[in-house]
């Protein structure tokens, strides 16, 4: 597996798990049939600039650097401000319409935010389809989108 693909898996794992040790990364990745060593994970952690932050249980877990998350949110707000046309929801789906050429970038930025509500995103030239994990989470995501749109 290529480094970029493995690091995408690591980001996904971070968004849904509190990972305290490098061995936990190895175990979770192997459960996905991705064969890695602790040394590889160590290099990925350094390369991705992961940090350890306090967890609710009293220990520490790995996280993306806060600055990167803030930069991503700024880019997301700016892209929405520049390209947003409209959005609609139905059941577990949110469809955001944007100016042509902006769909893939917006989908990538939304994925990079690692929102808990999102199961997956699809972006074409002028749309982003977001699939949420539940109806309740669709409403939560809708509120986040409203906040992002009203902040500019």
Curated annotation (Swiss-Prot):
This is Arginine repressor. InterPro entries: Arg_repress, Arg_repress_C, Arg_repress_C_sf, Arg_repress_DNA-bd, WH-like_DNA-bd_sf, WH_DNA-bd_sf. SUPFAM superfamilies: C-terminal domain of arginine repressor, Winged helix' DNA-binding domain. Pfam families: Arg_repressor (PF01316), Arg_repressor_C (PF02863). One of its GO terms (molecular function) is arginine binding. GO terms for biological process: L-arginine biosynthetic process; protein complex oligomerization; regulation of arginine biosynthetic process. Regulates arginine biosynthesis genes. The keyword DNA-binding applies. Belongs to the ArgR family. GO terms for cellular component: cytoplasm. Pathway: Amino-acid biosynthesis; L-arginine biosynthesis [regulation]. Its main location: cytoplasm. Keywords: Amino-acid biosynthesis, Arginine biosynthesis, Cytoplasm, DNA-binding, Repressor, Transcription, Transcription regulation. Disulfide bonds: none annotated. It is found in: Cytoplasm.
């Amino acid at each position: 597996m290529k480094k970029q693909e493995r690091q995408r898996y690591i980001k996904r794992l971070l968004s849904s798990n509190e990972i305290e040790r490098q061995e936990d990364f190895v175990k979770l990745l192997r459960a996905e049939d991705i064969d890695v060593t602790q040394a590889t994970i160590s290099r990925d952690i350094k390369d991705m600039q992961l940090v350890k932050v306090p967890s609710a249980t009293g220990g520490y877990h790995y996280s993306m650097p806060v600055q990167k998350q803030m930069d991503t949110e700024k880019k997301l707000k700016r892209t929405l401000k520049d390209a947003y046309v409209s959005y609609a929801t139905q059941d577990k789906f949110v469809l955001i319409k944007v100016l042509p050429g902006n769909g893939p970038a917006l989908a990538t930025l939304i994925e990079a935010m690692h929102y808990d509500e999102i199961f997956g995103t699809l972006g074409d030239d002028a749309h982003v389809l977001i699939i949420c994990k539940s109806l309740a989470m669709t409403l939560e995501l809708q509120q986040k989108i409203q906040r992002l749109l009203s902040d500019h």
